[in-house]
Amino acid sequence: MSAEEGTGDSTTAEVIEVVGKTGMHGEAMQVKCRIQEGSNQGRIITRNVLGPVRMGDVLQLRETQRDADSIGGR
């Protein structure tokens, strides 16, 4: 999404922790983020993010109800 496009129904969330890499080849990062507005304001959820991401980044989420599954280990 470019900066010129409208945000529509999206909600902003700030990355507070990078949990680790996930996906078949480690192409996605799992992050914990705090919802900054809306009915779920202040709630911390886990999401999978493609591309470079670090603490303090702000994400635009289309919906805030779903959590990502935790990264499994052996």
Swiss-Prot record:
Annotated transmembrane regions: none
CDD domains reported in the protein's UniProt record: S1_S28E (cd04457)
Keyword Ribonucleoprotein: yes
Keyword line: Ribonucleoprotein, Ribosomal protein
This protein's record includes keyword Secreted: no
One GO term describing the cellular component: cytosolic small ribosomal subunit
Pfam family, one: Ribosomal_S28e
Protein origin, superkingdom: Archaea
Molecular functions (GO terms): structural constituent of ribosome
GO biological process terms, semicolon-separated: maturation of SSU-rRNA; ribosomal small subunit assembly; translation
Family (UniProt): Belongs to the eukaryotic ribosomal protein eS28 family.
PANTHER family: 40S RIBOSOMAL PROTEIN S28, SMALL RIBOSOMAL SUBUNIT PROTEIN ES28
Protein name per UniProt: Small ribosomal subunit protein eS28
